[in-house]
């Protein structure tokens, strides 16, 4: 069977999954990568579209609400003499040349961007990261920031998507490896003659059903109660049924 046929059958047929123990490990590894791509697509899509909307909103606020400014010698320089707050796509954007705001104040706003007197602060879900202007080019103007947003949008989305895939792939490989360890316990209780190597391949295909289900839920932005426990319960049941399809050890009676 090709990978696509295996994918379809792995969603409902423990008997076909059981046959994969004779495959090469390379095919199973490739399969886990493909599952990772599938599982990462909804998250990558929503994060990417959210990032683009935030960047567009930030650009609009810069154009309309904030005065011209220059970042030079590690400081924000402008004719404006007071701090300004605006909102765009769920983010609070603070422009403060007066040093009235600090990192703590930006962080308290949960989701916020701060263009402060001597640093740039980004807060997401109440966790702030800051970058001193001394790390930036010798001079940066408002028009340069807007141009940079336009030029780097595609690169930022690509990097974010790649990071999401890598994190997802790492999670899936850990999931398969741990499920294979559970498989060692199951195969001993069922008296099956299987190596960890074979159990890893079986586990790679056994996570298909849960991966497809949670991919659909993420695409629909639906919340699943006890997602972690449900995921592992489904994986455990599928692997248990797969191992039941494999013949047990033959017991030789000595007379």
Curated annotation (Swiss-Prot):
Entry coiled-coil feature ranges: none
UniProt membrane topology term: Multi-pass membrane protein
Transmembrane spans: 28-48, 154-174, 199-218, 223-243
Subcellular location: Cell membrane
Pfam families from the UniProt entry: DUF1189
InterPro entries the record matches: DUF1189 (IPR009574)
UniProt keyword terms in alphabetical order: Cell membrane, Membrane, Transmembrane, Transmembrane helix
GO CC terms: plasma membrane
Name under which the protein is recorded: Uncharacterized protein YqgB
Organism per entry: Bacillus subtilis (strain 168)
């Amino acid at each position: 069977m090709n990978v696509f046929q295996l994918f379809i059958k792995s969603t409902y047929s423990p008997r076909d999954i059981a046959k994969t123990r004779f495959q090469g490990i390379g095919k199973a590894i490739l399969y886990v990568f493909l599952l990772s791509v599938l599982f990462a697509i909804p998250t990558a899509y929503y994060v990417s579209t959210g990032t683009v909307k935030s960047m567009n909103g930030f650009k609009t606020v810069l154009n309309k609400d904030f005065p011209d400014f220059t970042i030079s010698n590690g400081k924000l320089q402008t004719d404006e003499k007071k701090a300004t707050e605006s909102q765009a796509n769920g983010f609070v954007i603070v422009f403060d040349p007066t040093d009235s705001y600090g990192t703590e104040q930006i962080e308290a706003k949960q989701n916020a961007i701060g263009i402060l007197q001597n640093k740039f602060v980004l807060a997401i879900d109440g966790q702030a990261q800051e970058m001193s202007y001394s790390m930036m080019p010798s001079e940066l103007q408002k028009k340069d920031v807007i141009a940079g947003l336009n030029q780097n949008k595609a690169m930022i989305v690509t990097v974010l998507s790649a990071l999401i895939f890598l994190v997802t792939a790492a999670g899936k490989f850990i999931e398969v490896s741990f499920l294979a360890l559970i498989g060692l316990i199951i195969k001993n209780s069922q008296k099956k003659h299987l190596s960890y190597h074979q159990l890893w391949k079986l586990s790679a295909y056994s996570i298909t059903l849960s991966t497809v289900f949670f991919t659909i839920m993420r695409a629909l932005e639906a919340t699943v109660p006890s997602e972690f426990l449900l995921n592992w319960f489904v994986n455990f049941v599928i692997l248990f049924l797969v191992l039941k399809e494999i013949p047990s050890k033959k017991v030789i009676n000595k007379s």
